[in-house]
């Protein structure tokens, strides 16, 4: 079984320095789990680690796709699993570092991202049926095959109604039966997981976020977005919808002032951090490290190493 160390946490909590020190002390290589740092040319707005900051530690899944290319959790899982095996086969420790919870979950849960349990044509048929005969009619189709879903779901919740019908068509099972079976497989993964969440006082974290945004602006975030625009990258692209990029685009298009853009970036980043913390609390395997309780980052690193070795 492959040992896997995960260092996660909200934006601006200070994952980078700790992960570098851990990699140095544990003979590891780092795999980024960040949905923005995968894009080339988007360095300032994503707070991408620099070559100097890497201190010679190999980093994976940074600068892997062009900003116009689609990249999703399935793409991440495939690339990350390959990197994990490559690092382990070199006799080194794979260390996942980042704040994109869905990316991390794709590795520590046995999610199936294939289309084995999907039927697009049937979905389209049901969606068209809802348009022609109404959502209530489509909902009524559940009554004889999945009474539990029929009672639990409302006709207006068409997406979930369609999913329940689709699952029954493909598997012959109710959505609840199907879900229970999949839950049993969820923890069937080839990794020995050590999962740490870095956290700190909320007010201090928000101050760090605000300061980080100011630093991004002084480093040239506006110029970075202008350059991306000149390269042909547009607001409708997934990459350009990231926090920091979309607000600067609004400013450059004359929709808002610069002060408003900065305010919105800070607000969006704080809200994102809040959502990240909510997400990370869902996993009972994670160990939370409150940075405020330690006098130095070196102390945190030593604590993590001790817990990993004692496990």
From Swiss-Prot:
GO terms of biological process kind: tRNA modification
Segments of this protein annotated with the region Interaction with substrate tRNA: 34-37
Pfam families: IPPT
Keywords of this entry: ATP-binding, Magnesium, Nucleotide-binding, Transferase, tRNA processing
GO molecular function: ATP binding; tRNA dimethylallyltransferase activity
Annotated catalysed reactions: adenosine(37) in tRNA + dimethylallyl diphosphate = N(6)-dimethylallyladenosine(37) in tRNA + diphosphate
EC primary class: transferase
Similarity-based family: Belongs to the IPP transferase family.
Full protein name: tRNA dimethylallyltransferase
Biological classification of the source: Bacteria, Bacillati, Bacillota, Clostridia, Eubacteriales
Record gene name: miaA
